[in-house]
């Protein structure tokens, strides 16, 4: 015969069971809380242009996949990470993922970050080697640890512990050949002066871009992808192989919150591609979100950030004949209303997916002409 429970014992027993069941069903930091958001938000995914170029085996692009998953009920960040994985795994993308152009030693080191607006959680990895999809590792940093950023061997060890296959010497054959050509051009120019050496490395890479050996976009690489669903839940992710031929250990803006990516679930999201050092110095994604908080449209917020970057670019080596920045830098942003924009230092393109399907659109630009003018 079963023992009869009094009311106090019943409440204590059922409460404990409910808590245990709930804890077993969710990741370490829990599910996103229920949010009260304005009705009528139109779902949107906005990304750099490679978000509507690389395709999976079914011919689906990053923004299309993310939008379909998101509007089908998937968590927004899950959808975005699945979308950028298409680009990370594309062997023709030498600026993102395992096939990205390596560092000066011929080693591929990847960076990624993600932010979950409703959960107010973030995760990032920098300088991780031997992993094909760093954005997913960054997501697990957010979900399974109390940290926001893991770097180098520590990031790799964490990925291994999470079940990722670590591939030693992971490099795409095309990227390896391009690295060898860069080495051939720069070995005679290894000066004792670090500044001269760095400039020689950079100039050799840009010359390879001019000759068509490297796609200019892939020299800096990166994909940023941000999304908002019909409930107004906002997330973002940025992933990259970083600057081609970088000094080993260099981390740019992509894994740094506030630079390569920033999300405030009540305001909006912003992310970037282009010259990481210039973006990192100005924490531009944070600036954009704060401008949107003050009421600025995403386009105007991004223009404000670009003007700050231009104002703080004073080294002659970084200026063209017009006295303007001689590099590319682009921002992709959206606000809590579902308004979005792609804005660049110079004319470029970006990707977006709405109920009208995936599109590649022209960015708004701070300057006319080209960075090299």
Region roles according to the model:
Residues 12-20, 31-373:
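Alpha/propeptide regions of enzymes that mature by internal proteolysis
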């Amino acid at each position: 015969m079963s023992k009869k429970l009094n009311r106090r014992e019943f409440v204590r027993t059922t409460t404990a069971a409910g808590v245990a069941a709930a804890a077993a069903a969710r990741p370490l930091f829990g599910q996103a809380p229920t949010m009260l958001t304005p009705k009528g938000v139109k779902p949107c995914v906005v990304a750099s242009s490679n978000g509507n170029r690389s395709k999976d085996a079914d011919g689906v692009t990053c923004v299309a996949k993310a939008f379909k998953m998101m509007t089908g009920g998937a968590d927004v960040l899950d959808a975005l990470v699945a979308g950028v994985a298409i680009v990370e795994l594309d062997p023709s993308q030498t600026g993102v993922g395992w096939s990205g152009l390596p560092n000066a030693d011929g080693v591929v080191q990847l960076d990624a970050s993600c932010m979950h607006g409703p959960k107010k959680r973030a995760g990032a990895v920098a300088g991780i080697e031997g992993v094909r999809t760093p954005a997913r590792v960054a997501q697990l940093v957010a979900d399974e640890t109390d940290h926001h950023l893991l770097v180098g061997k520590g990031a790799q060890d964490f990925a291994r512990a999470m079940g990722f296959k670590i591939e030693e010497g992971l490099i795409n054959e095309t990227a390896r050949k391009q690295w060898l050509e860069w080495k051939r051009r720069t070995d005679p120019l290894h000066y004792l002066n670090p500044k001269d050496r760095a400039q020689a490395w950079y100039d050799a890479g840009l010359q390879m871009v001019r000759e068509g050996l490297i796609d200019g976009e892939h020299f800096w690489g990166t994909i940023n992808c941000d999304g908002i669903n019909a409930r107004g839940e906002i997330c973002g992710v940025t992933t990259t192989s970083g600057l081609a031929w970088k000094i080993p250990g260099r981390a740019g803006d992509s894994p740094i919150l506030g630079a390569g990516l920033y999300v405030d679930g009540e305001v909006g999201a912003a992310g970037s591609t282009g010259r990481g050092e210039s973006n990192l110095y100005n924490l531009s994604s944070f600036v954009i979100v704060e401008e949107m908080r003050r009421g600025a449209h995403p386009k105007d917020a991004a223009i404000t950030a670009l003007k700050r970057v231009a104002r703080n670019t004073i080294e002659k080596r970084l200026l063209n004949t017009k006295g303007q920045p001689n590099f590319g830098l682009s921002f992709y942003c959206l606000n809590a209303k579902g308004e979005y924009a792609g804005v660049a230092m110079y004319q470029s393109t970006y990707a977006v997916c709405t109920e009208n399907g995936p599109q590649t659109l022209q960015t708004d630009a701070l300057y006319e002409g080209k960075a090299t003018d």
